[in-house]
Amino acid sequence: MATNVSWKLNLAIQSGPSVTITNAVQVDAFDRIEVTVPDTTNSPTATTVDVQPSAVGKIKVLLIRSNKYGDQLKYRIHDNTTDERVLNDAIFLTGAGSLDLLEDPTAPLDKLLITNTTGQDVIVEIIVGRTAV
């Protein structure tokens, strides 16, 4: 049974325009994952988070947010051979074109490898909506 995921973006620029975008996407399944990523400053080590069991192209909406952001919070997609990226703010992607920024056929968005050297534990929340496996 399909589930409707609605979202709304409000963009307000001081002394400039305000833009509101709303949309919805139908997904077959969704997961909400919350993980505590321990600080590994003394010996940087990634925490592996299973995001979804599907192949490339199954994700329709993705939200990644944290209680702390910065250059010392980094992630990789799929495995440790992919590019390391900095989690310096929340990530919200919807649609194949946007999600292609993070995944490709050789590196599906099935896992996130998160390395935390911020000096304290960090809580990361991931919401993923996808088509059936």
Description of each model-found segment:
Residues 28-47, 87-90, 94-97:
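Solvent-exposed, conformationally flexible loop/turn segments
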Residues 1-20, 26, 116-133:
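C-terminal interaction-tip segments
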Residues 103-123:
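Noncatalytic modules at the cell exterior or secretory-pathway interfaces
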Residues 65-87:
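Short, surface-exposed beta-strand/strand-loop-strand elements in extracellular ectodomains
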Residues 82-109:
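Intrinsically disordered, low-complexity Pro/Gly/Ser/Thr-rich segments with frequent PxxP/GP/PP motifs
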Residues 17-22, 37-56, 118:
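Surface-exposed ligand/attachment interfaces on beta-rich extracellular proteins
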Residues 60, 71-73, 120-124:
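Short beta-strand/loop motifs in extracellular/secreted proteins, especially
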Residues 57-67:
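A short beta-strand element within beta-rich, extracytoplasmic domains
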